[in-house]
UniProtKB/Swiss-Prot annotation:
Pathway: Protein modification; protein glycosylation. Residues 567-579 have a biased composition (Polar residues). Its EC number is 2.4.1.-. It is an enzyme of class 2 (transferase). One of its GO terms (molecular function) is glycosyltransferase activity. Keywords: Glycosyltransferase, Golgi apparatus, Membrane, Signal-anchor, Transferase, Transmembrane, Transmembrane helix. The cytoplasmic N-terminal domain interacts with actin, while the lumenal C-terminal domain contributes to the activity of xyloglucan galactosyltransferase. Residues 549-588 are annotated as: Disordered. It comes from the Eukaryota. InterPro entries: Exostosin, Exostosin_GT47. This is Xyloglucan galactosyltransferase KATAMARI1 homolog. It is found in: Golgi apparatus, Golgi stack membrane.
Length: 588
């Protein structure tokens, strides 16, 4: 059979079918595995992906985190601000680049210069964490030079003798056996400036690094400064040292951290000596506490203003300054064991020039009572000038009457508590709104309150009121008073109590807590924008965590006019002037 040239028809058909199948396989492969994976693909799916990539690129890109160079110190201002973020631009995405997904980023938290100090409290291995104090090294004109001229510090008293023993004064004899064997001194009631500074020198958590300080102490003798120029000097002289101090502080980097709000100082006098409202030469005191920069600082005084927020009351110094815990514990045990034959007692003089004073009524009631002991004080020689006579009377009394002095407060209140005598107050400004750091806010635990208006009108019998208190309650109150003794005395500045906190320790702890809370409020933006300064006394009575105030039962006591124009006849000015008369009497 003759062969036909070329491939048979059946083979050609098979070849064409195979070629066609391979063609479509290549088409599908090219479409799904090559084109779909190319960045520039024009397919529907790839076009949507490209649109999404461009949309993401148009979002603002986050600024990369800044890593602070640890070798570069923080600048002085409290707020270390970041530069504004740069605006992101849409750039062409090259084939080798992958589109970056950008998430929404919140504004970075502010960085404050005091945050390092806050973090020290988190170091549990550091016993001083959160407790460091930085002390300014002031030029001697602000402190030591005043002591060298101690004879000029008071018009009525030579203060030089009280400078001995680190400000405690000369030791007291114990011929009558009223005191314990050690720790008793003839301490002047206005010596807190020196005592506090010398105690600070022994503070266990001092630091030279202000960036870790929980607070900053300014060792300016504000009380001595105002004392030396009050009589016979013009206002320029009275204000000079305070203005000089503020100028010096404001040039310091430590001041710029919080504008002075972490600074504190001590003025061992009543607040009214530092609150001159006008520049009239006849006006009283200096204006330290009204200077704008000084208002940022906290000032510790023996009597604060109920209507101002930058001064805080600390106890008057007593005669007892123990060197060790055992001295305190032995004294407390002795006060518990005493027999007290007198129901109540009073040491003081009448105030005939003050129509609102109830002292004359108290003296009259004491004279007519068979269960009251009276020490009448006036100019000249008096047992009121004898620490042993005063302490002996208090030790033999269950209750000690503590009306207002020439101002709200009296040193006598702390002398009586030191003797284990339950204080009887007649005005909340004498203790309850003053010493809120050192005394319980529930005043009924340690004292009796008899509103002075009832005494003034003759409607209240002190004897009957005190006799109505059950003996078991009296015993409980006396124990509370005795337990408070460490908190209302200043230990010997040359030593330190080990387990007990004295008035210095309580004050420093309170200042640290105040500054720490303020710093946290600044960071969290929780500062109280509704704070009313003239109601400061109400805020001091709030419990921890409370911020809201309202009407109070003591409003009538603090509603009297406040310093209208700062004239010399206003109540606070008169109180300050009259307090100086007590330096002539020798007894407040």
């Amino acid at each position: 059979m003759e062969k036909v040239g070329g491939k048979p028809p059946q083979s050609r058909l098979c070849f064409l079918a195979t070629l066609c199948a391979m063609f479509w396989v290549l088409i599908f492969y090219f479409h799904f595995f090559v084109i779909a994976n190319e960045p520039g693909s024009a397919g529907a799916d790839t076009a949507a992906g490209a649109a999404a990539s461009i949309a993401r690129a148009e979002l603002p890109l986050p600024e990369p985190e800044r890593v602070s160079d640890p070798a570069v110190p923080l600048p002085p201002p409290a707020l270390v601000s970041e530069p504004p973020p740069t605006t992101a631009t849409v750039a062409k995405v090259e084939d080798e680049e992958k589109p970056t997904a950008v998430a929404h980023q919140e504004a970075a938290p502010r960085d404050y210069a005091f945050q390092r100090a806050l973090k020290t409290a988190e170091n549990k291995s550091d016993p001083c964490g959160g407790r460091y104090i930085y002390v300014h090294e002031l030029p001697p004109r602000f402190n030591d030079d005043m002591l060298r001229e101690c004879e000029r510090l008071s018009l009525w008293t030579n203060m030089c003798k009280f400078m001995s023993n680190e400000g405690l004064g000369p030791p007291l004899g114990n011929e009558e056996g009223v005191f314990s064997n050690t720790g008793w001194y003839a301490t002047n009631q206005f010596m807190v400036d020196v005592i506090f500074r010398n105690r600070m020198k022994q503070y266990e958590c001092l630091t030279k690094d202000s960036s870790i300080a929980a607070a900053v102490f300014v060792p300016f003798y504000a009380g001595f400064d105002v004392a030396r120029y009050l009589w016979g000097h013009n206002i320029s002289t009275r204000d000079a040292a305070s203005l000089d101090l503020i100028d010096w502080l404001r040039k310091r980097p430590e001041w710029n951290v919080m504008g002075g709000r972490d600074h504190f100082l001590v003025g061992g006098r009543i607040a009214w000596d530092f609150r001159r409202l006008t520049d009239e030469e006849s006006d009283w005191g200096n204006k330290l506490l009204f200077m704008p920069a000084a208002k940022n600082m906290s000032m510790l005084v023996v009597e604060s203003s109920p209507w101002n927020a930058n001064d805080f009351a600390i106890p008057y110094p007593t005669y007892f300054h123990p060197a060790k815990d055992a001295d305190v514990l032995l004294w407390q045990d002795r006060m518990r064991s005493l027999e007290r034959p007198w129901l109540f007692s009073f040491a003081g003089a009448p105030r005939p020039d003050d129509p609102k004073s109830i002292r004359s009524q108290l003296i009259d009631q004491c004279r007519t009572s068979s269960v009251c002991k009276l020490l009448e004080c006036d100019l000249g020689e008096s047992k009121c000038h004898s620490p042993s006579a005063i302490m002996n009377m208090f030790q033999n009394s269950l209750f000690c009457l503590q009306p207002q002095g020439d101002s709200y407060t009296r040193r006598s209140a702390f002398d009586s508590m030191l003797a284990g005598c339950i204080p009887v107050f007649f005005h909340p400004g004498s203790a309850y709104v003053q010493y809120t750091w050192h005394l319980p806010k529930n005043y009924t635990r340690y004292s009796v309150f008899i509103p002075e208006d009832g005494v003034r009108k003759g409607n209240v019998s002190i004897e009957d009121r005190l006799k109505s208190i059950h003996p078991d309650m009296v015993k409980k109150m006396r124990e509370e008073v005795i337990s408070l003794i460490p908190r209302v005395i200043y230990a010997d500045p040359r030593s330190k109590l080990e387990t007990l906190k004295d008035a210095f320790d309580v004050s420093v702890e309170a200042i640290i807590n105040k500054v720490t809370q303020l710093r946290r409020d600044i960071i969290e933006d929780h500062e109280d924008k509704d704070f009313v300064e003239e109601n400061s006394w109400k805020y001091d009575l709030l419990e921890e965590g409370q911020r809201t105030i309202g009407p109070h039962e003591w409003d009538p006591f603090f509603s009297k006019p406040k310093d209208k124009g700062g004239d010399s006849t206003n109540p606070s000015t008169n109180a300050a002037k009259n307090s100086w008369k007590n330096e002539q009497r020798g007894q407040n």
